[in-house]
Amino acid sequence: MGLLVSRVLRCRDSSLLEPQPEAIAGASYIPGSRKRKRNSLEELATSSNVHGPQNQGMYPHQVLNYIYWKRVKISSNDAYQNLFLDGHDSDIKIRALGRTWCLHKVFLCQSGYFANILKGTWRESHHGVINLIIKNEDIDTRSLHFVFGALYTDADLSITPLEVPQVLAAACLLRVDRVIQQCEGIMKETINRNTVCSYYLAAETYRLKAVKTRCFEWLLCNLMVHPSVALYKEVDLKLMYLLALSSDLLVMQKEIDVYTTLKIWMFLYLNPCWNGTMKQLLQHANNWLSTHMAYVDNISFLESEEGLIFQPVFKKLRFQHIICDLTSTTILEQDRLIPMAWLSPIYKQQWLTLLRTQEYGVIGPQVINEQELEECTMRCGTMIPKDGRYTWKWSVGRLGFPLRVTFTRQCVILRQRCQRCDGSACHNHIRNVIFRITLVCFDSNKRVTFRKTTGYKILTFEYKEEQIVMKLDSDVLTFPMCIFCNFLFVNLGNAENK
């Protein structure tokens, strides 16, 4: 109990440690009698058991003085059991949420909240009882009990990950830094699909910046790579808005798949009682949307009363990378989810950009604009199931040029494909592209075990040219592995849709 005693002694204050008059029994206390107090403490020194029957009338400050003067260590288990759980020698009661705790001022003063309450004129107007009115619904009796108990022991008390947000809320209310730090450590180590959203909300509420950042990074990596019905049900509107906005979102396949993810998330948001598998989810979402829109004329779903709250999230889709192929455009039109007022300016913008590219021989972006990269790059990705050589292309429409990606255990290669795109912007033999390649490996718990990125770079390609854009150490690679790319072929913003 050495650390516990030192913590309590450091926060001792005469206004906290003096027994309250209403708690004193008659003649056993004589104000100002130092001789009597000194004699009683000398009598205590003859006993080796501070919790023995002869000492049941001791006040907590006497217990601490005894420990301090005699250099006797009492285990924190004894303090936790005898003083906290059994309530021996309690000099104050805390009432909250329908429960009463018999506690001790010398331990409560470790809480910044109670240290302030117990000062000044409090003891003049109360009778050894503090009534807490708690309006925070995250705090319950279990979390309060945990935080009170932590004041009586040096050891970290056991807590499950799912209980952490409630304990953190109680610790922040009572201002117990040690418990806040314990919660922060547990949260950092136990982020998974069952905890990530509750941790994120708690970290945002109670300003744990490092935890909030880790949770957001976990979601960026796993939202589309490891989709889950349970996870999607937990993501709220604000959080999904931030995820859809980010260029760091690890997108599986293409931008149309971000749209699909938002569609099934919206379905679950509006139908929280739906139970099924990820394989069933898209079909159910499509059927639900089709049935709903059968009774709606002239407007899209996002323009309906139910859909209005989702508009900010869907506006962050990069439609210029969705309408670049017929299949994706057909999906948008059939769903009638997106307002035509959003899409018409994008069609116009794409067409004018294509004409300018062909007319003036634009070779592509020549400077890196951070804001444009964050808002406008094409996001795409795929899974590498096992070791080997893989080659594929992502459709980039007529504003890009035919780019082929090759992955081997030694490197990643980008190449301008051999065939020309008649009538497209790729008639120029020399073209620029801004790109970023990111490789990620996960363990069985969906945690990132390996990550490597090129950062954003500009490459100039001549016709049929190939370039190695990332070299790899084959010894550190594990499979399956995910490869993600961000591309910007022209300086094309989403200005009409912001």
Swiss-Prot record:
Record keywords, A-Z: Developmental protein, Differentiation, Nucleus, Spermatogenesis, Ubl conjugation pathway
Gene3D superfamilies xref list: Potassium Channel Kv1.1, Chain A
Motif (Nuclear localization signal): 33-39
Highest taxon above the source species: Eukaryota
Listed PROSITE patterns: BTB
Primary location: nucleus
InterPro entries (alphabetical): BTB/POZ_dom, Gcl-like, SKP1/BTB/POZ_sf
SUPFAM superfamilies the UniProt entry points to: POZ domain (SSF54695)
Pathway: Protein modification; protein ubiquitination
Subcellular location: Nucleus matrix
Cellular component GO terms held in the UniProt record: nuclear matrix
Signal peptide start and end residues: none
Span of domain BTB: 90-160
Any single biological process term in GO: protein ubiquitination
Free-text function comment from the UniProt entry: Possible function in spermatogenesis. Probable substrate-specific adapter of an E3 ubiquitin-protein ligase complex which mediates the ubiquitination and subsequent proteasomal degradation of target proteins.
Subunit structure: Interacts with CUL3.
The protein's name in its UniProt record: Germ cell-less protein-like 2
Organism: Mus musculus
Lineage of origin: Eukaryota, Metazoa, Chordata, Craniata, Vertebrata
